[in-house]
A protein has these predicted regions:
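Short, aromatic- and cysteine-enriched interfacial helices/patches
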Residues: 3-10, 28, 35-36
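Switch/coupling subdomain of P-loop NTPase systems
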Residues: 4, 10-16, 21
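Short hydrophobic/aromatic residue motifs in ordered secondary structure
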Residues: 60-62, 156, 272, 300
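Short glycine-rich anion-binding loops that position phosphate/pyrophosphate groups of nucleotides
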Residues: 207-209
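Primarily NTPase-proximal linker/entry elements flanking Walker-type ATP/GTP-binding cores
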Residues: 17, 21-152, 159-179, 187-204
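Conserved catalytic-core segment of NTP-binding enzymes
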Residues: 162, 182-197, 211-317
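Residue-level signal for short, function-critical loop segments
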Residues: 153-154, 244
C-alpha cells in the first residue's frame, strides 16, 4: 500500500529493523509453517494464523479482531492466495494501529504552550522506567528543549540515584528529596522549579509498586492533584512504561495501571532482546492508548518515537 513509504532516516530505520529482528524472524517462521502446503486462505489457514498471532503475544482480543477482518476480505474476494497473506496482515495491522495511533510523528516533539509540558511516568520497577526517563531527557534536550527531572519515586534509594546518574549524564537539573519523602512534595517542588526556570519539559518519575492497587491509585491521584496547584492542567501526559520482553505480563501491568490512573501514552521497552514484539500491537488495541515510544536497544539513541508504518514495515519485511 502507498502509505508504507519510508519515513525514518536510514540510520534510525536500521536500528528499528535490528531491534525487531527476533520478533520478525519468529513471527515469519511461524507464519510460514501456518500456510505450508496451502495455496489459498481457508479455515485451516485462519485457525493456524490465530495460533501464530496469539503465540506472538498479540493477545487474544486483538488476534480475533485481525482474524475477523481477514475473514471478511476472504469472503468478499472469494479467493485469497496464501502468498498474499503477508501483505494482507501488514495492511490490517497497520489499519488497527492507526485507530489508536493517529499521528505520524518521527521526532521527539511536545505541543506548543507557554507553561512547561509535564510528563508523569508510571510503571512497575524493573521495566526500564528510569532509563526511559533519562533517554527522553536526552532526546528532548537534543531537540533544543530545556528539561527538568523530578525524582518522585521516593521509596527506593536506587531509583533516586539512578535518576541522578541520568541527570548528570544528560546535564539536566534533577529535583530530589531524601528517600521516604512525600512523592507529592517532590512533584510540587519540581514543577515550582521548572516554572521559575521557564523549562519546556518536566519529566517526573513515580513509584512502581503494584502490591496494593488502592494505595497506588491514591498516591498517583495525590501527586496529580498537587501538580495542579502549581500548574493547572498538569500532568499533560501520563506515560506508562512496559517491558516488551515480558509478553502477556505487560497486559496485566497495563490493566492495573489504567485502573489506577488515566494513562494517555505508552512506552514499550526492551524489544531488541525478545521475540515478543507483537505485544505492541495488542496493548495499543486492547487498551485504546497510543504507543508513543519504543525501546529497541541499550544505546541512548535507541529509544524511538513510535511510528506505526515503520514498525509494521520492520515487523513484516
Amino acid at each position: 500500500m502507498s502509505f508504507f513509504k519510508k519515513i525514518f532516516s536510514k540510520e534510525k530505520k536500521e536500528t528499528l529493523d535490528k531491534g525487531l529482528e527476533k520478533t520478525k524472524t519468529s513471527f515469519l517462521d511461524k507464519l510460514g509453517k501456518a500456510v505450508a502446503g496451502k495455496s489459498k486462505v481457508d479455515e485451516d489457514v485462519l485457525d493456524n494464523l490465530e495460533e501464530v498471532l496469539v503465540s506472538s503475544d498479540v493477545g487474544v482480543t486483538t488476534t480475533l479482531k485481525v482474524i475477523d477482518r481477514i475473514e471478511a476480505r476472504v469472503s468478499k474476494d472469494k479467493y485469497v492466495g496464501t502468498a498474499e497473506l503477508n501483505k494482507i496482515l501488514r495492511e490490517e495491522i497497520a489499519a488497527l494501529l492507526s485507530e489508536t495511533n493517529s499521528g505520524n510523528a518521527t521526532e521527539f516533539e511536545i505541543p506548543q504552550q507557554d507553561a512547561p509540558y509535564v510528563i508523569m511516568v508510571v510503571g512497575v520497577n524493573g521495566v526500564g522506567k528510569t532509563t526511559t526517563i533519562g533517554k527522553l531527557a536526552h532526546q528532548f534536550k537534543k531537540a533544543g528543549k530545556s528539561v527538568v527531572l523530578g525524582a518522585a519515586d521516593t521509596f527506593r534509594a536506587a531509583a533516586i540515584d539512578q535518576l541522578q546518574i541520568w541527570a548528570d549524564r544528560t546535564n539536566v537539573p534533577l529535583v530530589r528529596q531524601n528517600m521516604g519523602s512525600d512523592p507529592a512534595s517532590v512533584a510540587f517542588d519540581t514543577l515550582e522549579s521548572a516554572v521559575k526556570q521557564n523549562a519546556d519539559v518536566v519529566i517526573i518519575d513515580t513509584a512502581g509498586r503494584l502490591h496494593n492497587k488502592v494505595n497506588l491509585m491514591n498516591e498517583l491521584t495525590k501527586v496529580k492533584r498537587v501538580m495542579q496547584k502549581v500548574l493547572p492542567g498538569a500532568p499533560h501526559e501520563v506515560l506508562l512504561v512496559l517491558d516488551g520482553s515480558t509478553g502477556q505480563n505487560a497486559f496485566e501491568q497495563a490493566k492495573q495501571f489504567t485502573a489506577a490512573t488515566e494513562v494517555t501514552a505508552i512506552a514499550v521497552t526492551k524489544l531488541d532482546g525478545t521475540a515478543k514484539g507483537g505485544v505492541v500491537i495488542g496493548i495499543s488495541d486492547q487498551f485504546q492508548i497510543p504507543v508513543k515510544y519504543i525501546g529497541v536497544g541499550e544505546g541512548v539513541e535507541d529509544l524511538q518515537v513510535f511510528n506505526k508504518f515503520e514498525f509494521v514495515d520492520s515487523f513484516f519485511k
